[in-house]
Amino acid sequence: MRLEQLQAALRVAETGSFQEAAQKVGCNQSTISRQVKGLEDELGIALFRRQGRMKLTAAGERLLPRLRRICQEWQTACTEIEELLTGRQTELCMAIADSIGGCYLPAVLNRFQQQWPSIHLRVSTLGSDRALKVLRDGLIDLAIVMDSPTLTTSAGLVVDLLLEEEVQVLLSVDHPLADQKAIAWEQLSHVPQVVFKDGYGMQRLVEQRFRELGLELNSCLELNSLDSFRGVVREGYWLALLPQAALVDARHDPRLVIRPTAEPRLTRRIKLVIPEEQLSLPPVRHFRQLCREAMTAELCDFKTLSQLF
């Protein structure tokens, strides 16, 4: 049973004539007749009385309401898909890491909204692991996350490197290490640290660096809010290793200081992840282009970014 057969039967029922039905859909009469006959053969019963004007049989009368619903649903589906393909979707959903959303993304969102004012933006702040899961589940259109080993093995995903930024040390002005110009990893291993919760890319990145250096990470507290990080570090007991984007507000806090680590320096890579099929949608393609323009080599200098955002 094919959609064309159902549409042909509906047109004949509406017009009462093979000829008029053919004119309505723009094909010849024999095509309509063949499609209706094929449907009747498949159902095993006649749908029309073929004497004079075509009239529905009892079976045809029962089928007619369903024919209308099926054909209407198909037309609605075609219209909605056309709207997507021509950029007339109503919303764009994305998930981002907390530190990215507050620093790098506002200008991109602003430019996108100015150019696509009819699209409602939905931005969720999630850890990288969770963001990738909801992306794969089809609940969002795109994600901006930290680099992950799983990204290199993810079929069907288009992955763009947006930027690479340094991870630095956030301390209280009263912390014993605050006077140092750069803090050695050996020293960091002996002081209590605040880290991101499990499932956040930053936690894995920091843990991996300590393992590579043969050191132990002294993590004493897990958080997932940048405000909470700043609050507990102000108390002077803990310190935190955070990416530059997460340190924008801390730079203006007189009770906090930021120091680089000694060599080897640690960086994190931020990537835009989009399912391949989503790139057929104009708003998604345009958002991708805006992200790539915003994260050019000139804008990836942190001092420039901190002034812009």
UniProtKB/Swiss-Prot annotation:
Pfam families, A to Z: HTH_1, LysR_substrate
Cellular component per GO, a single term: cytosol
CDD domains (alphabetical): PBP2_LTTR_substrate (cd05466)
Record's function text: Seems to regulate utilization of fixed nitrogen by controlling the expression of a certain gene(s) involved in nitrogen metabolism.
Keyword flag Transcription: yes
Lineage of the species this protein comes from: Bacteria, Bacillati, Cyanobacteriota, Cyanophyceae, Synechococcales
Family annotation (InterPro entries): HTH-type_LysR_regulators, LysR_subst-bd, Tscrpt_reg_HTH_LysR, WH-like_DNA-bd_sf, WH_DNA-bd_sf
Annotated HTH lysR-type domain residues: 1-57
DNA-binding region, residue range(s): 18-37
SUPFAM superfamilies referenced in this protein's UniProt entry, alphabetically: Periplasmic binding protein-like II, Winged helix' DNA-binding domain
The UniProt record lists the keyword DNA-binding: yes
Protein name as it appears in the record: Probable nitrogen assimilation transcriptional activator
Organism field: Synechococcus elongatus (strain ATCC 33912 / PCC 7942 / FACHB-805)
Family as reported in the entry's similarity comment: Belongs to the LysR transcriptional regulatory family.
Record keywords: Activator, DNA-binding, Transcription, Transcription regulation
GO molecular function terms listed in the Swiss-Prot or TrEMBL record: DNA binding; DNA-binding transcription factor activity
Encoding gene, per UniProt annotation: ntcB
